Design a protein with these regions (language model features):
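Short, Lys/Arg-rich nucleic-acid/phosphate-binding segment
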Residues: 51-56
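Conserved active-site tyrosine of GNAT-family acetyltransferases
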Residues: 41, 59
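Arg/Lys-rich, alpha-helical DNA-contact motif
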Residues: 1-24, 29, 48-49, 61-135
């Protein structure tokens, strides 16, 4: 784990950590998201990651949780622009929960419709497998 320094924080001695966190390679290994993608998320404003004194990104639990949630949203085919809109609202803080809720509910409806389509397609595949004597 590497120490993170925050702007305006008092300098710490070599053994005194301002904050512990994980480097980009460790987060990539934990989340399955490539370092390139993690950097991309930062560039497009989805992820703001503090840096240590040497300029390396240091991910805390909040950043890791965000990466995991972004990954789940992407798995459901939520467009990047919608994920950006959601996290813009989150980053603005309290007062826009209704907008966040509406965005997530709309996406949930899209996901449920897609699941229904996939279940129908799976049924057709299962039928063909049974036709050929498979199980």
């Amino acid at each position: 784990m590497t120490a993170v320094t925050h702007p305006g924080a008092a300098p710490t001695s070599a053994g005194e950590d301002a904050r512990e966190g994980l480097g980009i390679a460790e987060v990539a290994a934990i989340t399955g998201v490539t370092p390139h993608t993690l950097r991309y998320y930062g560039r497009i404003g989805l992820l703001s990651v503090p840096r240590d004194a040497a300029g390396r990104r240091i991910y805390g639990q909040a950043e890791i949780n965000r990466v995991v949630f972004i990954t789940r949203l992407r798995l459901t085919a939520m467009p990047i622009r919608d994920i950006q809109a959601y996290f813009r609202l989150v980053d603005e803080g309290p007062g826009n929960e209704d907008e966040r809720l509406a965005l997530l509910e709309a996406h949930r409806d899209t996901v449920k419709a897609r699941i229904t389509e996939l279940e129908s397609a799976l049924g057709a595949i299962e039928f063909k497998i049974a036709t050929y004597g498979g199980s």
